[in-house]
From Swiss-Prot:
Protein name per UniProt: 5'-methylthioadenosine/S-adenosylhomocysteine nucleosidase
Function comment: Catalyzes the irreversible cleavage of the glycosidic bond in both 5'-methylthioadenosine (MTA) and S-adenosylhomocysteine (SAH/AdoHcy) to adenine and the corresponding thioribose, 5'-methylthioribose and S-ribosylhomocysteine, respectively. Also cleaves 5'-deoxyadenosine, a toxic by-product of radical S-adenosylmethionine (SAM) enzymes, into 5-deoxyribose and adenine.
Gene: mtnN
Species per Swiss-Prot/TrEMBL record: Shewanella sp. (strain ANA-3)
Metabolic or biological pathway: Amino-acid biosynthesis; L-methionine biosynthesis via salvage pathway; S-methyl-5-thio-alpha-D-ribose 1-phosphate from S-methyl-5'-thioadenosine (hydrolase route): step 1/2
UniProt xrefs under InterPro entries: MTA_SAH_Nsdase, Nucleoside_phosphorylase_d, Nucleoside_phosphorylase_sf
Source superkingdom: Bacteria
UniProt keyword annotations, A-Z: Amino-acid biosynthesis, Hydrolase, Methionine biosynthesis
Class of this enzyme: hydrolase
Family assignment from sequence similarity: Belongs to the PNP/UDP phosphorylase family. MtnN subfamily.
GO cellular component, one term: cytosol
BP terms from Gene Ontology: L-methionine salvage from methylthioadenosine; L-methionine salvage from S-adenosylmethionine; nucleoside catabolic process
UniProt catalytic activity: S-adenosyl-L-homocysteine + H2O = S-(5-deoxy-D-ribos-5-yl)-L-homocysteine + adenine; S-methyl-5'-thioadenosine + H2O = 5-(methylsulfanyl)-D-ribose + adenine; 5'-deoxyadenosine + H2O = 5-deoxy-D-ribose + adenine
């Protein structure tokens, strides 16, 4: 079993890379891919860069060059669920674009033309993540809708509009739906694991800078615990 792990920023992958053994690296198109062992599993970890295009490039290269059995997207997010605090975790129940609008042609808001409205993670990956929750200690984790767009959300007016479109949204970020769409295209199972760095409000820029390391660590911890729960025979 080989698992691809993608984070956008250095704090989102640093703890994973530090915990790897037998690591070797290869750089393709300016993106470093580090292969090795983590939590007893063969993994390839990469820092994609920020945003949907960067994430799509990294995911495509990862799948084409390393043929992972599954892909995990890890990192930080802005929180929308009232039950969560900074540092808590959202496991994707589904992933959607929040900045796509081709409703003029009969698609749902957030649905890219000729694509599903929502990208659904592999049940066995979500199950492993849920099993890992018990080991998180005081960090809370829930399943929920994660939405993606090429904007850092800190405007209350925009937040209100997003919640009108996606009332069950638990978190938003800038890569997950792009990674999910590429995985969907290639038929590769995925899950998105995000820890909250801010609450998508006026304080978000300050909160993000203050808490990105904490969020990156919590998300990385969740990924490592998830890997420990994975049964190599469960790939489907």
């Amino acid at each position: 079993m080989k698992i691809g792990i993608i984070g956008a920023m250095e704090p989102e992958v640093a703890h994973l890379i530090a915990a790897m053994t037998n690591a070797s690296s290869q750089t393709i198109a300016g993106i470093e891919f580090i292969a090795g062992t983590l939590a007893g599993k063969d993994v390839v970890v990469t820092r994609s860069g920020i945003g949907k295009v960067a994430a799509s490039i990294a995911t495509t290269l990862l799948i084409e060059k390393y043929a992972p059995d599954a892909v995990i997207n890890t990192g930080s997010a802005g929180g929308f669920a009232d039950s969560l605090s900074i540092g808590d975790i959202v496991i994707s129940s589904e992933v959607r674009h929040h900045d796509v609008d081709v409703t003029a042609f009969g698609y749902e808001i957030g649905q890219m033309a000729q694509q599903p409205a929502a990208f659904i993670p592999a049940p066995y990956l979500v199950e492993a993540a849920n099993k890992a929750i018990a080991q998180l200690g005081e960090v809370k984790a829930i399943e929920g809708l994660i939405c993606t767009g090429d904007s850092f959300i800190c405007d209350p007016v925009r937040t209100k509009t997003m919640l009108e479109h996606f009332p069950t949204m638990a978190a938003c970020e800038m890569e997950g739906a792009a990674i999910a769409q590429v995985c969907h295209q290639f038929g590769v199972p995925f899950v998105v694991i995000r820890s909250l760095s801010d609450n998508a409000n006026n304080d978000s820029p300050v909160d993000f800078d203050s808490y990105i390391v904490k969020a990156g660590y919590h998300s990385a911890l969740m990924v490592m615990l998830l890997l420990e729960q994975l049964d190599p025979n469960s790939v489907k």
